[in-house]
């Protein structure tokens, strides 16, 4: 039995990059996401840890870039690292708008004005890892 499907865009991969692309495409497009397995079986779903971003007033983009380059041991391209770090705060904001419930210092406080619970993890000189508690 053959089935013919028509889409404007075929996104190959259902990890963070593929799903982010699919969510950011114009809504009038017919989009299909192709995955080699169940969405809950991919690497992104099982990844532990959080997302690194400059969210603390004592942190800077330059410090984050330096930490990443040191941890990368020569494997990272500085211009790519800088571009990623410079846009990390807006990426976190986009995730919040998509409904990601990042952990806050005071879970009972209203979202507006409530600081996020940030941690310092391997390779980072400042608290910049934001998590969504399970």
Task: Give each language-model segment a name.
Residues 9-33:
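N-terminal Rossmann-like FAD-binding beta1-loop-alpha1 element of flavoenzymes
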């Amino acid at each position: 039995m053959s089935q013919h499907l028509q889409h404007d865009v075929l996104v190959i991969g259902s990890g963070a990059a593929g799903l982010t692309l699919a969510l950011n495409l114009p809504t009038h497009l017919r989009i299909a996401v192709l995955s080699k397995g169940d969405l809950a079986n991919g690497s992104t779903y099982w990844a532990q840890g959080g997302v690194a971003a400059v969210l603390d007033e004592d942190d800077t983009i330059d410090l984050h870039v330096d930490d990443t380059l040191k941890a990368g041991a020569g494997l990272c391209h500085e211009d790519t690292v800088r571009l990623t770090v410079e846009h990390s705060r807006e990426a976190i904001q986009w995730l919040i708008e998509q409904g990601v419930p990042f952990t806050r210092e005071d879970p009972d406080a209203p979202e507006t004005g409530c600081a996020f619970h940030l941690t310092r993890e391997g390779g980072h000189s400042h608290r910049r890892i934001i998590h969504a508690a399970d």
